[in-house]
Amino acid sequence: MKMKTIIRQVVLGAAVLAVAGCASYRWTSGVPKEMRTVCVPTFRNETDITELGNVTARQILREFQREGTFRVARQDDAAVEVQGVLKSQNTEYVGGDRRTGMRYGVHNLTVKAVVSVIDRRNGKVLVNNREYTAMGSFTTGQDVATHRRDASGRVAEDLATKIVDDVLRMKW
């Protein structure tokens, strides 16, 4: 075989593999245009972290705005509604260092939630009670409750990212 023929076959094979790898890629969103408005009511909060339901809903709305596919709308004007319940939270002591003369500890905060996505145009449940877990860590001195509340904002951000990513990847 001639060298030119071999080079052509290699280039052709590489092109076929490249096209096959990109076959499912889209330059535009897979979300239908008529579904690109969203509302997120305050999540029901069954944890003992004050205001976590409000903070989580706000973070989800911010994540939708940051991502840009959906426009945030009032509940009456939205095509999609994301509903959720914050089911539980757990604060776990991870460790600390007493050598500094100051007592402090490192803790992990884990929050579990269930989320549903509703098509408000016809009432169809698109996602029914999908479970999510979000986690964040924090360092404390004497006041664990205050530091846990501060960490809950970061946990809400983590939860928001996971939920919005899943909504964007849904089969519409």
Which positions does each model-derived feature cover?
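Surface-exposed short loop/turn segments
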Residues: 26, 67-71, 77, 81-126, ...
